[in-house]
Amino acid sequence: RAETAKEMAAIMPEGDSPRRKAGAMPAEYTHQIIAEKVYEKLPEEICSHARELFPFDLGAQGADIFYFLHPFRRRNLGKIFHNEKVYETFESFRKAAVGADNTVLSYIFGYITHYAADCIFHPYVYSLTQKMVDAEPTRRVRWHSYIESDLDTYFVKKFYRKGVNRFECRLRAGKGVPKGVA
């Protein structure tokens, strides 16, 4: 338990957690920041096709938005895209990219940053989640979401030197979903 508490303290600054910010989706900011940092490093030949930031930022949220939307009530689309239809999703992107305009390409590039970030961070998040569940098996907490939210706090402080409650990601400033993405 002490080891787990120390690990959590390293990423959970007191009183400044995104889960306390109304409307903040867990890991929304982490994915946004990673996408911004990747965008800064893209070679010009790729960057020239990803100039539209709103679809790029929307893509950076990946299928996470579908965890919170349940249009079919029976199946969670977020789980389907993350766990069952990964190949199909990327295959559809490959086909859509042929001859696509910059709106579609921007979205696809953003989505790729989301997938890459999940591949890097989810093993850590799952491991830490299991430690928290083992430490407090009777406590009903969504540890996975809490840990991801606290990673948001860490990255906002690291890269923007401000509290997460004062951070506004570019996606929230966007104006609607572009036609090519919808």
For each feature predicted by the language model, list its residue ranges.
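General structural signal for secondary-structure boundaries
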Residues: 18, 27, 86-89, 177-182
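Long, charge-rich alpha-helical interaction segments
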Residues: 164-182
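Non-membrane alpha-helical segments in proteins
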Residues: 108-112
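N-terminal amphipathic/basic-hydrophobic helices that include classical n-h-c signal peptides
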Residues: 1-24
